[in-house]
């Protein structure tokens, strides 16, 4: 393909001066109405609007102020939080806590990654320190009925170690034995119920099953963000029988960042979206185009955009039925003054394998028989320069096939750049899925502002969808600040 055609194809991807002054460019160039200072939160399950007075990006300090009985400073979300409950509310009360402890186990039933267990600890500790009797519920895997390999027994030692107390485990999640264990649970004690998905009624959100779960407790805390997008008995059904029903610290933090920081970001605000298919990220891209100043695209989806602009893509992954959509998204970005950057060079391979022959070519130079598997060094440089201008960044999806070392450079470069920006005070949000695996692989997870624990839940929240597990919780009482 002629270079002139390539130049023409990429000319609409970079707004003049947009990277250096993207917020200003966006305001001038937008042909469509931009939302004013407040954005409706009702589609997300909240009762009010999202503005800078109502959303906090400093969850840690907020939790400390709750513990110190000081002002929360802001109302971070319109759902009641466990931090709103005092010792007087909790002492001696039986609290049903739905956590997401769906951790990976090896063939020896040993936990290989305890991230989700550690993420649930702050809420559980807060409850036991305030004299509550904690009834802990979670699922593990996708069992078909009672399945021994999906028992929660392997979780007990690690839970006990992290909490500093001996956690008791029930052999069921409802029934007389469980009721007896609950009755003997001391203040500050923790009872782990058996896998709630051993009952098919859980995923069917069966009202009678939900009622049996709820009958064990006095109030409800949902800290399972990873399942908040599912209307299951333990995430949505129980709220009809337990009041108050509130968010745990982890769920609250997810909402603070994935709703608060994204809806009212410090600008310039950049979104990085990767992954293999446009179809799986349509909702995210469309939603972020309404909010961001800079949009960086990577991963296998870029080849659908390339082909939509008339470029040859060789044997790269392309969704033929999404070519028109790709063109529409590019036009929408231009109309809104969003600086949308596609990679200008890519790493191509002659087969999809770790030992493939590979080379770096311009985006306009992908030959027949070659497939793109990562972004190239020039693109990394351009993306990094764009990110250097930002104050808020959210990342969802890898830049290439990072599981293969030959094609991991782009993803690892983004992870390292976000770590660098985090240390400079930029708000960095890792929006779930493979991006989380990437920052953990590079060893920079600890410096990010927020790493989402949700996969599908993160995507649906970013798309602006209603999360049943969130909308079912009690509304917060507004705080004057």
From Swiss-Prot:
Name the principal localization, coarsely classed.
plastid
EC code: 2.7.2.3
Q: Which residues bind ADP?
A: 275, 299, 402
Indicate the transmembrane segments per the record.
none
Keyword Zinc-finger recorded: no
Q: Which GO terms describe its cellular component?
A: apoplast; chloroplast; chloroplast envelope; chloroplast stroma; cytoplasm; cytosol; membrane; mitochondrion
**Superkingdom in the source lineage:** Eukaryota
Q: Where in the cell is it found?
A: Plastid, Chloroplast
This protein's pathway reads: Carbohydrate biosynthesis; Calvin cycle
Residues that coordinate or bind CDP = 275, 299, 397, 402
Q: Where does Mg(2+) bind?
A: 434
Q: Identify which top EC class this enzyme belongs to.
A: transferase
Extract the GO molecular function terms from the UniProt entry: ATP binding; metal ion binding; mRNA binding; phosphoglycerate kinase activity; protein kinase activity
Recorded family membership: Belongs to the phosphoglycerate kinase family.
What is the protein name for this chain?
Phosphoglycerate kinase 1, chloroplastic
Gene symbol of the encoding locus: PGK1
